[in-house]
Amino acid sequence: SLSDKDKAAVKAIWNKISKSADVIGADAMGRMLVVYPQTKTYFSHWSDLSPNSAPVKNHGKTVMTGVALAVSNIDDMTTGLKALSEKHAFQLRVDPSNFKILSHCILVVIAMMYPKDFTPEAHVSMDKFFCGLSLALAEKYR
């Protein structure tokens, strides 16, 4: 679980990167679809799955809106992300292992865009945060 120090670190990093959230999300989505091509099955209804396509960029923005929601509910992500968990479990039927894949891609992009801020300590806190976020999204699968 996240310590108070982790929560403070996540909030500090989010405060710094949130202005670029759309770019981070778009890049992370594009990377996920290229590096983990099996994830494309969830987006087969999109006309263009290339990294810079409009659907990929738009979904990246949507994903980062969810990350913002998780940051704002950092003390209880399971409750705060309940509706998103239900949507992904019952409507979209996304395999919850994909949450970890996309989380990793987001961490990679943050590290590339903010190398001075993404210290080893920040990395640990953000990784723990995304593990918690993934777990919260997987809650309705049980």
Swiss-Prot record:
Boundaries of every Globin domain copy: 1-142
What protein family is recorded? Belongs to the globin family.
How is expression of this protein distributed across tissues?
Red blood cells.
Protein name from the UniProt record: Hemoglobin subunit alpha
Tell me which InterPro entries the record gives: Globin (IPR000971), Globin-like_sf (IPR009050), Globin/Proto (IPR012292), Hemoglobin_a-typ (IPR002338), Hemoglobin_oxygen_transport (IPR050056), Hemoglobin_pi (IPR002339)
One Gene Ontology term from the biological process aspect of the record: oxygen transport
Positions of modified residues (N-acetylserine): 1
Matching CDD domains: Hb-alpha-like (cd08927)
Q: Which keywords label this protein?
A: Acetylation, Heme, Iron, Metal-binding, Oxygen transport, Transport
- SUPFAM superfamilies from the xrefs? Globin-like
Kindly state one GO CC term assigned in the UniProt record.
hemoglobin complex
Q: Which domain of life is it from?
A: Eukaryota
The Gene Ontology terms for molecular function here are: haptoglobin binding; heme binding; iron ion binding; organic acid binding; oxygen binding; oxygen carrier activity; peroxidase activity
| Miscellaneous comment | This fish has just a single hemoglobin. It displays a weak Bohr effect that is not effector-enhanced and shows a propensity to form disulfide-linked polymers in vitro.
Q: How is the subunit organization of this protein annotated in UniProt?
A: Heterotetramer of two alpha chains and two beta chains.
PROSITE patterns linked to this entry = GLOBIN (PS01033)
Per UniProt, heme b binds at 59, 88
**Main function:** Involved in oxygen transport from gills to the various peripheral tissues.
Source organism (scientific name): Lycodes reticulatus
